[in-house]
Regions:
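Walker A/P-loop
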Residues: 278-279
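Short coil/turn segments at secondary-structure boundaries
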Residues: 67-71, 185, 220-221
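Charged/polar positions within long, soluble alpha-helices
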Residues: 55, 59, 81-88, 109-119, ...
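Conserved NTPase motor "head" modules and their coupling/switch loops across ABC/AAA+ ATPases, GTPases
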Residues: 200-275
């Protein structure tokens, strides 16, 4: 079952998701499409990663690097269509080549920040420096793309001739356009072998965005990292309904946290009408 199938359950999950401060729309879409983990190992692994982010976020000394990371994550865009074109050996247009270059440069920048925060071991980001080299032959490190003169001496010469012409020269233009098309085809073929790495990098950056947002939400709501019990007893201490708690606080009222423990047998919750039984459930 995917998360998007559960968000309408009346347990405050949608409220928490709506208040999750992610920096990319792609990250939120990926979260909603996430398959809910069912095995203990996957759940513990997710919490282990989140705990590392939490420990980094709560340290004031890391704030400058975290601000830089958040700023970079705002530039994360989904380019799955372009990646699929690479997988299918299509020739990319200039916009798609720009998207690939932008993602590769963004991945490298974020990888450097993750190293400084000592989080690089938590989430693997593929090395895309070769992709940048292919799309940045002059080493300018600028997140723009066009068919650079460096790709072809002949193209450079044709462009030079067109610049000095007073009138539009259709023959020169067509010849230059033909060379540009050949270069696009060559670049697309070179980049096609990096399609899987680009896809993995895109997902890794979104995963970083999500864990960063979850870490801040953990601090904001004073949440805990649960232990998974293996003795058949489920126990919660200080449990609260986030949406109800938030609504009460806006009226200067307090939510009374609930402690509850139950076994793998039928459990009956009793209490007065309007006493909070449904909220607990």
């Amino acid at each position: 079952m995917r998360l998007k199938q559960l968000i309408e359950q009346p347990c405050g999950l949608k409220f928490m998701l709506d208040n999750l401060d992610v920096h990319s729309g792609y990250s939120r879409r990926m979260l909603l499409d996430t398959e809910m983990p069912k095995d203990i190992l996957s759940i513990e692994n997710n919490y282990e990663i989140l705990k590392e982010f939490y420990d980094v976020v709560k340290e004031q000394k890391n704030q400058s690097q975290i601000n830089s990371l958040q700023f970079k994550l705002c530039n994360l865009k989904e380019i799955q269509g372009t990646i699929n074109h690479l997988k299918n050996k299509y020739v990319l247009d200039d916009i798609e080549l720009f998207e690939v270059k932008h993602l590769a440069m963004l991945s490298i920048d974020i990888q450097q920040i993750m190293n400084k925060l000592q989080l690089n071991d938590m989430i693997f980001i593929p090395n895309l420096e070769e992709v940048v080299s292919i799309l940045d032959p002059d080493g300018m490190k600028i997140a723009t793309f066009y068919i650079y003169d460096s790709y072809s001496g002949k193209l450079s010469e044709l462009r030079r001739k067109m610049k000095v012409k007073e009138d539009f020269d259709e023959a020169l233009f067509n010849e230059a356009s033909g060379i540009e098309d050949e270069i696009r085809a060559k670049l697309s073929m070179q980049l096609s072998k990096y399609a899987d790495e680009l896809e993995a990098a895109q997902k890794s950056l979104a995963f970083i965005d999500l864990n960063l947002a979850k870490a801040y939400q953990t601090i904001k709501y004073n949440l805990c990292f649960p232990n998974i019990a293996d003795d058949g007893v489920t126990e919660y201490e200080g449990m609260f309904h986030p949406e109800v708690k938030d609504a009460l606080e806006q009226k200067d009222r307090a939510f009374q946290p609930v402690d509850i423990a139950f076994w793998n047998k039928p459990t009956l919750i009793t209490g007065a009408n309007m006493g909070g039984k449904t909220v607990v459930l």
